[in-house]
């Protein structure tokens, strides 16, 4: 990163491959990405960084990412998986409750998905505005200062 820009890692996370109940048998197997391509895939749209990430991940294994269904937001993926429309990569935190309820199944991969990060890039020559500071604090696990609070709504599923 070139000065005066600075990058702060706000959060790291892992994504896992999941499928609906009809894919339960796959939950006891370890699949290669080539085998995953034999099943319908659900993915975020081509204009997203997530799509680019998985496109590169597949290319590193000499494969092309060819999802059957593309969606606009991550929260649209889980209902499609639950309704048996295909396999998908989801952040562990989003998938864990549905896995615990046996609504979906986690599918192991021979080559695990690399860890991802949520980063904030900012210009060190300019101070962060109040909403940006508050969002940064929330993501880093801090709290919003009451006297300086702003209207930030964070929705968790």
Describe every region a protein language model picked out.
Residues 6-16, 101-114:
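Short beta-strand->loop
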Residues 92-101, 111-157:
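C-terminal effector-binding regulatory domain of bacterial HTH transcription factors
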Residues 25-26, 40-61, 128-130, 136, ...:
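Secondary-structure junction motif
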Residues 1-3, 71, 153-157:
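Central regulatory/effector-binding core of bacterial HTH transcription factors
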Residues 20, 44-45, 67, 90:
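Thr-Gly-centered strand-to-loop micro-motif
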């Amino acid at each position: 990163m070139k000065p005066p820009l600075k990058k702060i890692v706000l959060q790291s996370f892992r994504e896992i491959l999941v499928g609906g109940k009809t894919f339960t048998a796959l939950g006891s197997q370890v699949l290669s990405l080539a085998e995953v391509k034999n099943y319908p895939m659900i993915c975020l749209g081509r204009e997203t960084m997530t799509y680019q990430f998985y496109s590169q991940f597949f290319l590193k294994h000499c494969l092309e990412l060819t999802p059957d269904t593309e969606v606009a937001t991550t929260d649209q993926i889980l209902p499609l998986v639950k309704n048996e429309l295909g396999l998908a990569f989801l952040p562990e935190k989003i998938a864990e409750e549905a896995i615990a309820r046996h609504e979906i199944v986690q599918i192991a991969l021979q080559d695990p998905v690399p860890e991802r990060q949520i980063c904030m890039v900012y210009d060190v020559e300019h101070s962060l505005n109040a909403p940006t500071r508050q969002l940064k604090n929330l993501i880093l696990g801090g709290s919003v200062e009451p006297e300086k609070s702003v209207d930030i709504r964070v929705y968790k599923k």
